[in-house]
Amino acid sequence: MTEVETIIKTVLKTGGYRLGSKSTLKSLRNGEAKAVIVASNCPEEVLEKIKSYDVKILVYNGTNMELGALCGKPFSVAAMAITEEI
């Protein structure tokens, strides 16, 4: 298991996260996001918006479908915000 996968598993247990590009960007605008995890195939326009914030960005080596599955969701997840210290 990679470091990013370990972080994902931890925040899924504690609830300190927001799933999806829109929720992630909202968390960034509100100053709630401490870090962001993006799928390897995250859309470029979303990634550029995330990069405009001063936040740590971690890249999950799987696709958005794989990230969604890892999060226990039946849909793709291109980005997720971590809202607690990691």
From Swiss-Prot:
GO terms for cellular component: cytosolic large ribosomal subunit. One of its GO terms (molecular function) is RNA binding. Signal peptide: none annotated. InterPro entries: Ribosomal_eL30, Ribosomal_eL30-like, Ribosomal_eL30-like_sf, Ribosomal_eL30_CS, Ribosomal_eL8/eL30/eS12/Gad45. Belongs to the eukaryotic ribosomal protein eL30 family. PANTHER family: RIBOSOMAL PROTEIN L30 (PTHR11449). NCBIfam families: PRK01018.1 (NF002172). This is Large ribosomal subunit protein eL30.
